């Protein structure tokens, strides 16, 4: 099942030095988790390994390698930067658990944004409260969720962009 053993075993043998060596991380290093989860794996020569296996409600399966994840997450990060979104900007992910959710999350982290994943079943009031309190600048969503976003737009002065990931 797992090559890491039980939780109890890992607690007994855990050592930060081993983890630092394994991850290539040294105390005080600054890392970008988005880059760390994709680009670093590719640089290690493991780009063709599977990074994500997604299964939809109709049992549709999509598989993505680390190389594909790197390209997709970099594409999102670059697009967000072209919109003049910058490090520290809050960017909401308001969508179902589709592959774009994961690409978007890592892409936001890569460009230095603050990823704000929100439960896609939220209604207008719950969505508004979170977007308003966070001063969210952009929202990445699916077309089917626009009906929840449109009625609250006029009351969200910080929200500059709505990015729809499907047709």
Residues covered by each model-derived region:
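A short N-terminal helical cap/helix-turn-helix that marks the beginning
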Residues: 2-10, 29-52
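Conserved AMP-binding/adenylate-forming core of the ANL superfamily
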Residues: 48-106, 123-128
């Amino acid at each position: 099942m797992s090559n890491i053993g039980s939780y109890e075993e890992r607690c007994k043998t855990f050592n930060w030095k081993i983890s630092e060596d394994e991850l290539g991380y040294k105390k005080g290093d600054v890392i970008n988790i988005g880059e760390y989860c994709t680009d670093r794996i590719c640089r290690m020569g493991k780009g063709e390994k599977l990074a994500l296996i997604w299964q939809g409600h109709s049992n549709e399966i999509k598989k993505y390698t680390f190389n594909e994840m790197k390209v997709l997450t970099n594409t999102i990060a670059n697009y967000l930067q072209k919109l003049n979104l910058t490090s520290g900007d809050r960017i909401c992910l308001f969508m179902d658990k589709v592959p774009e959710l994961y690409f978007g999350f890592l892409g936001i982290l890569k460009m230095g944004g603050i990823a704000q994943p929100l439960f896609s079943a939220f209604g207008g009031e719950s969505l508004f409260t979170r977007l308003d309190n966070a001063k969210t600048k952009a929202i990445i969503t699916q077309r089917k969720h626009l009906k929840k976003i449109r009625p609250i737009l006029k009351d969200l002065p910080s929200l500059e962009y709505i990015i729809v990931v499907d047709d």
